[in-house]
Regions:
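Mature extracellular/periplasmic domains of secretome proteins
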Residues: 103-107, 165-170, 202
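Cleavable N-terminal signal peptides of Sec/SRP-targeted secreted and luminal proteins
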Residues: 2-18
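Flexible, glycine-rich phosphate/dinucleotide-binding loops
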Residues: 55, 89, 160, 186, ...
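Short, structurally constrained coil/turn elements
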Residues: 12, 76, 111, 147, ...
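Catalytic domains of cell-wall/extracellular-matrix polysaccharide-remodeling enzymes
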Residues: 113-194
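Functionally critical loop-and-helix segments that line ligand-binding/catalytic clefts
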Residues: 19-28, 170-233
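Substrate-binding cleft of extracellular glycoside hydrolase catalytic domains
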Residues: 19-150
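Conserved beta-strand termini and adjacent loop/short-helix elements that scaffold enzyme active sites
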Residues: 83-85, 154-156, 214
Length: 233
């Protein structure tokens, strides 16, 4: 029986790796050698945080900026995307926070066509009023559209329901979804590394999905990261 389980697990892994590429998302400083380590470990992409809450207006996360620039300036053979974790209880609007992201990227010579917006309840206090949260997100989405930046949303079905109540949001029609499905932290809490468990919610359907986080809080190349999969082009 144990051998059969091992065979099935191995077969599923082979299927997953045939259709998907692996990535990590992180919110910690990285070095040149650690980025090389990710690439050597067959990770095809990094998702780096470029904005984080600070209890006031939110602030640019320079760790993510530096990681992106290290990859870009050294022509390292690994992809990189950016995400922002908005300060949902800050004094400024979603639009103003997106402006801070855009200005930081532009100032540092980063031409990111898409910014993923983290809409999760983990370590992020949202308003109890769904309408306030929707207004914040709509402000951010509209500003991105004005600046010509595509939007991705990082969330889950339960978080989206908790934060927006599945109310009408101005999620752009060309927005893509990065969803997470993890049982608990660490290797034993991983879900299947594929999109097979996705169920449509809110404005998102199967066609929206481009990335899935299937593992949370693991150590890779000496860093605390989350692990993801995305479809091969």
């Amino acid at each position: 029986m144990a051998l059969m389980k091992l065979f099935i697990a191995s077969a599923l892994f082979s299927i997953a790796t045939a259709q998907y590429l692996y990535a990590v998302d992180l919110a910690v400083p990285t070095t040149y050698s650690q980025i090389q380590c990710f690439q050597q470990a067959k990770y095809a992409n990094l998702f780096v945080r470029v904005f984080k809450p600070d209890g006031s207006t939110g602030q640019v996360d320079m760790d993510g900026i530096y990681t992106y620039k290290t990859i870009q300036n050294n022509n390292l053979p690994i992809g990189v995307d950016v995400y922002m974790k908005p300060d949902t209880l800050a004094k400024n609007t979603g639009a103003q926070q997106f402006d801070m992201v855009y200005q930081a990227l532009t100032k540092n010579g980063i031409n990111a066509r898409r910014v993923f917006v983290q809409v999760t309840i983990e370590d992020t206090p949202w308003n109890f009023d769904h309408n306030v949260n929707i207004q914040f997100l709509n402000s951010l989405f509209l500003r991105a559209k004005q600046l010509g930046i595509l939007i991705g949303v990082y969330t889950s079905a339960s978080d989206w329901q908790t934060i927006t109540g599945n109310g009408a949001t101005l999620v752009p029609s060309d927005a893509v979804l990065w969803y997470y499905s993890v049982y608990w932290d660490g290797v034993t809490g991983e879900s299947v590394p594929s999109f097979d468990d996705f169920v449509a919610f809110g404005p998102f359907n199967k066609k929206s999905v481009v990335v899935k986080q299937f593992a949370h809080a693991e150590t890779v190349c000496g860093l605390n990261v989350n692990r993801d999969v995305f479809m091969k082009a």
